Structures are given as structure tokens and as C-alpha cells.
């Protein structure tokens, strides 16, 4: 009878593993799309932070434009900043890049800024510069530290002892 109906005896795909892999890849792609949308919403918070100017400073702060920027930064700096992508997208932490003003495309220092979950007198969430590292997780230089502290002070951010 199944021959007459031209029905297959086995209703599973010919290659179940291939079908599974395609489905799993599509699920990961959807998760990545959702993460990217969350990142886009949360990255706007960092834009004003990058517009703070420190007189006479040779550095600037740059916000990542995409999650891919975190991967590129991690690769250039040989550290794990890409593993923070989900936390950044969900707004649990923020990552910025300190660059030389004359060479803003070259990685210099990666900076993590975390919300304190406290509210200041203006009703805004407060933030702490949690960590800042050069390539290979090397400590920042005194000059970079001085810039970062001035930048944080202008924004009303505190600075952790992990610098």
C-alpha cells in the first residue's frame, strides 16, 4: 500500500545529523540576531561617554559599534573581551576602547565600566570603571591611568582598585 501512495517508509530525513546541524545553526543565528538587537539598544548609553574631552589629553574613548568589534578587540589585544558580549548586550556591563587620539583605529586599552546599581542625587544609575587592560592583560601605564581617572571623574564614575 505504501508503494501505491508513494509514501516513504521512514519519515525521518535521509541524514538526520545534517538536518539537526542545520536546525542548530539556525537557532544559534536567531540567538545571535537577538543579542545584536539588544546590543544596539544598550550601546546608545555609551555614546555620551565617548564625547567627554580632557584638555591636553592624547587619548580618546571609543564605543564598540557592534558585537564583532569586541571579537576584533579581543583578537588584537589577546585577551577575553569577546566573552563579555552577552553581558554587554544585556546591559550588565559596558566595554569601551581607549585609543591614541592620533591613531584611533589601533587598539590600546580595553576598559570595562559596570553599573553600580545605585542612584545618584540626579536619579541616574552610577557607574564604576571596573578594569582597564592593555594587550595580554598588561596593566595600563601611569599616563593612561591618569587620563582614565580624569575621564571617569568628568562623568561622575568611580574607579575600582583593579586598575
Label each region the model flagged.
Residues 1-163:
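Catalytic-core elements of nucleic-acid end-processing and repair enzymes
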Amino acid at each position: 500500500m505504501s508503494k501505491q501512495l508513494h509514501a516513504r517508509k521512514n519519515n525521518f530525513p535521509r541524514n538526520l545529523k545534517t538536518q539537526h546541524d542545520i536546525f542548530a545553526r539556525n537557532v544559534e543565528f536567531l540567538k545571535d540576531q537577538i543579542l545584536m538587537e539588544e546590543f544596539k539598544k544598550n550601546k546608545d548609553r555609551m555614546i555620551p561617554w565617548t564625547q567627554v574631552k580632557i584638555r591636553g589629553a592624547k587619548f580618546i574613548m571609543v564605543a564598540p559599534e557592534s558585537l564583532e568589534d569586541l571579537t576584533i578587540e579581543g583578537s588584537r589585544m589577546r585577551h577575553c573581551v569577546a566573552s563579555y558580549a552577552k553581558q554587554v548586550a544585556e546591559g550588565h556591563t559596558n566595554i569601551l576602547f581607549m585609543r591614541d587620539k592620533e591613531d584611533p583605529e589601533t587598539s590600546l586599552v580595553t576598559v570595562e565600566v559596570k553599573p553600580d546599581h545605585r542612584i545618584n542625587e540626579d536619579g541616574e544609575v552610577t557607574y564604576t570603571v571596573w578594569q582597564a587592560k592593555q594587550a595580554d592583560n598588561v596593566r595600563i601605564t601611569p599616563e593612561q591611568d591618569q587620563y582614565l581617572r580624569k575621564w571617569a571623574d568628568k562623568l561622575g564614575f568611580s574607579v575600582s582598585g583593579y586598575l
